[in-house]
Design a protein with these regions (language model features):
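Long, contiguous bundles of hydrophobic transmembrane helices that form the permeation core
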Residues: 2-19, 192-307, 462-464
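Membrane-core helix-loop-helix motifs of multi-pass transport proteins
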Residues: 4, 143-250, 398, 420-457
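Hydrophobic transmembrane alpha-helices of multi-pass solute/ion transporters
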Residues: 12-86, 99, 103-107, 252-325, ...
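Structural signature of hydrophobic alpha-helical transmembrane segments
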Residues: 15-22, 75-77, 132-133, 280-281, ...
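Hydrophobic core segments of alpha-helical transmembrane domains in multi-pass membrane transport
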Residues: 22-33, 45-53, 81-88, 121-124, ...
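Membrane-embedded alpha-helical segments and adjacent helix-loop junctions characteristic
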Residues: 59-144, 299-390
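Alpha-helical transmembrane segments of multi-pass membrane proteins
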Residues: 81, 110-126, 148-168, 186-199, ...
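C-terminal transmembrane helix pair
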Residues: 111, 198, 354-464
Length: 464
């Protein structure tokens, strides 16, 4: 009996050491980013090295494996993020983004300005960063108010409802891309499920926009540098070619996910689908299409084209570094045997263990968002940690739902340390209190709705 008790004690002690390493790692990341305002890349690398030094393994390999994990992660997502940045910048420069917005306004009409702005934000925020989308659409909200004399707050919140949801849930925006890489989620599946979760969340956000506008009408105020009408462009591309940079990668990646299992293995069609549906190739082709459209419409000089591409790649460079550091951090947590320790703490059926992981992913992303302000950093860090905790027996449902739980959680907790908070407030002319009641509350609604839809889908469509 004594021997059995001693064995149990040793087993418990062995399980607690990885948990303590995890807690120390969280403390380092949050302390450096929030307390000392250290760049997320530096904080994650320091945390990864610390975890690697404490984890089992030969001392000669402890730093080497950090560098190897960094290279592996950068190799898996570097091209995709760089190409996504090129697509976003060139779509704005060519007028393709403006053309898509005009199409939604024309289809739904200015009398349905709220749904038109939500739909525009929803679609454009898939390839374009949120702040750029908001900057593009806010003049339309002001123009609609000038024409109707009402519903300004509804238009502003409607933009955020669409743009914020896909920013956190649908690749190829950086956060969802990293979630897919860290959790080894099929990118096409995350596009489909992410959009499925984001759509009803955005719809509820639009309803909240209408309700809040009635309860708290806000006048349109003058904002320096923001016009009340969209900036006219000399020429816009046709709608058919304007949507190619968005539609092409979605069709190629999702098409591979859907149709490849139905094709004969090693056939010409299957091999072609495998190549074209690879996320790297799909985003490269989409970037080529977007750059070609920009050249055709704007006829830039080689110098202007080079500067535009350099600008887009520089914007993606820091994201690649932070993403690779997050993947390195997750790999070192795996080396510290965090996963088996967490599995033993929540021993039971795969389904109950999976539900605990969903809740953990949502809450961890929310806490990180609240602590340091960035949804992207919250998604990178939370997915890296959760990747090391997935039970060996699986979750009882597809890991894609853990990804949408993390993405949903990263929306909750936006306040004055979030750059998005200030972009929304300053460009719309709202006060801090009005922003808390509209922006911060909206993101709670989007995040909680996304989390609940994710939970329901694990039962209705587990995809296990």
């Amino acid at each position: 009996m004594a021997a059995a008790g001693g064995s149990a004690g040793l087993r418990g002690e062995g399980e607690m050491i990885p948990i303590l390493i995890l807690l120390l790692a969280i403390l380092i990341v949050v302390g450096l980013i929030v307390g000392l305002r250290i760049n997320a890349f530096v904080a994650l690398i320091i945390a990864a090295i610390t975890v690697s030094l404490l984890a089992p393994g030969d001392w000669g390999e402890k730093i080497v494996r950090v560098a190897q994990a960094f290279g592996s992660t950068a190799g898996s997502i570097g091209i995709v993020i760089a190409m996504a940045a090129v697509i976003g910048v060139t779509m704005m420069a060519s007028g393709a983004a403006d053309r898509i917005v005009q199409a939604f306004i024309g289809l739904l009409g200015r009398e349905r300005g709220g749904p038109a702005l939500t739909t525009s934000g929803f679609v454009l925020s898939i390839p374009v960063f949120f702040d750029t989308v908001f900057y593009l659409l806010i003049p339309l909200a002001r123009s609609m108010f000038t024409q109707t004399g009402k519903d300004y707050l509804k238009y502003v919140v409607a933009i955020a409802a669409g743009a914020a949801a896909t920013h956190a849930l649908v690749p190829p925006t950086p956060g969802p891309l990293v979630i897919a890489a860290n959790l080894s989620i099929d990118l096409g599946l995350l596009i489909l499920i992410g959009a499925l979760v984001a759509l009803p969340a955005s719809t509820l956000g639009l309803l909240y926009a209408g309700w809040l506008n009635r309860k708290m009408p806000v006048p349109m105020r003058d904002v320096p540098g923001v016009k009340s009408d969209p900036e006219p462009l000399p020429q816009l591309p046709g709608l058919g070619v304007a949507v190619i940079p968005i539609v092409l990668p979605v069709v190629l990646i999702a098409g591979k996910t859907i149709f490849l299992p139905l094709l004969e293995a090693e056939s010409f069609i299957a091999n072609t689908a495998t190549i074209l549906g690879d996320p790297n190739m799909a985003l490269i082709l989409a970037a080529i299409a977007s750059v070609t459209l920009y050249i055709h419409i704007r006829r830039p000089s080689r110098t202007c084209l080079g500067e535009l591409l350099e600008q887009s790649l520089m914007s993606g460079g820091l994201i690649i570094l932070i993403t690779a550091a997050g993947g390195t951090f997750g790999a070192m947590l795996q080396a510290a045997d965090i996963g088996p320790a967490i599995s033993n703490l929540f021993a039971g059926s795969a389904q109950s263990s999976g539900l605990v992981m969903l809740l953990l992913g949502f809450c961890m992303a929310s806490l990180l968002k609240f602590a340091q302000g960035s949804s992207t950093v919250a998604m990178i860090t939370a997915s890296a940690m959760l990747a090391a905790m997935i039970p060996a027996g699986g979750l009882g449902f597809n890991v894609v739902y853990l990804g949408t739980a993390i993405g949903s959680g990263s929306l909750v907790g936006s306040w004055m340390n979030d750059s998005g908070f200030w972009i929304y407030a300053k460009m719309s002319g709202l006060t801090e209190v009005e922003t808390l009641k509209s922006w911060s509350a909206l993101l709670v609604i989007l995040g909680v709705t996304g989390g609940l839809i994710t939970l329901v889908l694990t039962f209705l469509l587990p995809l296990a």
